[in-house]
Each structure stands twice: as C-alpha cells, then as structure tokens.
C-alpha cells in the first residue's frame, strides 16, 4: 500500500505506454481468435410481417464485444457500474476503483469467457472493501439481481468465488489513485498568487463529471492522475473561454506552463475525450444489450458458447432483435 502515486503499484505495475498497452491487447485479441474462431451467432427478426427470425454471424474479427475496440461495450460497462453503485449509495471513489478494476481485468480476460454482470457486481464488492465502505454481500447481490435477474445468480458465494478470480487477475494490486484529489489541489494552487484564479462551483462540477467520464477511456492505464485532472480542468476552462472568459484561459495556460506537467500527455488525454464523445453520439444500448443476451442466455449452434455457471443464469432464454431496435423474448 502506498500513499504516494509515484511509489504505488498503479505506477510501477499497472501503468502502460500506448505501445505496451496495444501489445497486451493484441495478445488477448489473438487468444480470442483462437478460442472463438466461429464468432457469435445472433437471432434477428426478419424484415417481412410473417418472416421467420434469421441467424446472423458476427465474425470474431468484428469490434463487437471486444472491450478495447467496442465503445458501445465500454460505455455500457460504465453505466452498469454507475447504476448499481447508485442503488447502493456507494461513494464515487469506490466506483472509480471498480471502473479501474474492470478495465484492468479486461486486459487479461475476454468478455466472452466471463459473465459481465457478475464481473461488475464483484468489482463493486471488492472496491467497496478496499475503499473501506464495505457492502453486505447479500444486499449487493439482491440489488444486482433486481437490476439484472437473468444474469446474476442468487447465491452470494458466486460473487466471492469471482472475487478470488478477480484478485488473481489484478495480481493482488488493489490500491488505486484518483484524479479527484489532484483536481482539488490544482484548483487550490490556482487560487494563490500570482494566478488568483478562482474556479466556480460549476467549473469544478464540470471537471468532476469529466473525470467520471474518463473511466470509459484508457487514460487511467496510461497517465498519472494529475495529468488527467489537468486535462479535465483545461477542457472546462476552454468551454468557459468560448463563452467569453478569455482572461481565464490565458491565466490557466500560464499555470500549465509553470507547472511543468507533460503537455503531450495532457493533449493525448484530451484527444481521448474527443474520441469518447464522438463514439458516445453513436451509442446504441439496445444493440449491446442484445449481443450480451445472445452471448449469455441463448443456446448457440456453431458460435460462441457460455456455460450456465459462467453466465450466472437460471437457464437459457431466446431473444430476438427487432428492426426498431427492441429486444423480444427477454425481461432485461
């Protein structure tokens, strides 16, 4: 355990360069191609009024259901953690830790070989223990089942079993450092001379929201927390500057130059935000939910298969995607 990011396992064990992160994901990509060469078969409703459902194959080389390439999946995972966290009134720090656990886990394991909903539940359970705001496991499982009854098993021991698997994949490095505290420290430094720049509560709230969104991206696997905080504050100040506060932008730019923060890393982080919001405009939740229903609940012929235990379901249930984007034959 380390109180300093610079001596922490996050920096020494779980911080990647762009190149090393790409190599790590390429290994998982190759493994998925070997394990699931036939891809995933899905059942889609035919175009005509009386048309029969049609089976469609999604090749394994498609981006769908690959965490590193499928922003639909990333955004959906983010919403799953936030939804369950809010039901349990979990602190944001613990949810941030859960997001990092999930991102690290998805470097080592495919979504096709685990139950995503059980993974989300376990990440929150473990994060709450690490952040010293533990949740009773039965309460956690009951709330998770109220959201995703088909996917989360009623037996709490399934979560504890998955917890050991999660800890093993994380190599027992549990401590996570956040940009939230760095953002507060930067805001305090800006208030002091010679900058005398006071950010409004709305500015700080916008920056906080940007940090929340950053957990969908790779920046927490790439850069120190203070770089992410600086990028979020820079975006907030730019938005204020566009509204007419030019002096604010000039003062903040001077502060960034004086701070000696790596501006290339800050700009890379901002670019990740731009990429994220571009994909967010195209976010299609019914599609990713449908794919996960097919992956975990529907019996497959010649495609990806997931056992009932791994899916955490009471049994198979057929689901069909209709032309208007709704899912039939399911309750989630």
Curated annotation (Swiss-Prot):
A GO BP entry: positive regulation of transcription by RNA polymerase II
GO cellular component term, pick one: mediator complex
InterPro entries for the chain: Cyclin-like_dom, Cyclin-like_sf, Cyclin/Ssn8, Cyclin_C_2, Cyclin_N
MF term (GO), any: cyclin-dependent protein serine/threonine kinase regulator activity
Domain Cyclin N-terminal, chain residue ranges per copy: 74-175
Keywords associated with the record: Activator, Cyclin, Nucleus, Repressor, Transcription, Transcription regulation
Location(s) in or outside the cell: Nucleus
Domain of life of the native organism: Eukaryota
Predominant place of localization: nucleus
Known role: Component of the SRB8-11 complex. The SRB8-11 complex is a regulatory module of the Mediator complex which is itself involved in regulation of basal and activated RNA polymerase II-dependent transcription. The SRB8-11 complex may be involved in the transcriptional repression of a subset of genes regulated by Mediator. It may inhibit the association of the Mediator complex with RNA polymerase II to form the holoenzyme complex. The SRB8-11 complex phosphorylates the C-terminal domain (CTD) of the largest subunit of RNA polymerase II.
Family: Belongs to the cyclin family. Cyclin C subfamily.
Subunit structure, as described in the record: Component of the SRB8-11 complex, a regulatory module of the Mediator complex.
The protein's name in its UniProt record: RNA polymerase II holoenzyme cyclin-like subunit
Natural source organism: Eremothecium gossypii (strain ATCC 10895 / CBS 109.51 / FGSC 9923 / NRRL Y-1056) (Yeast)
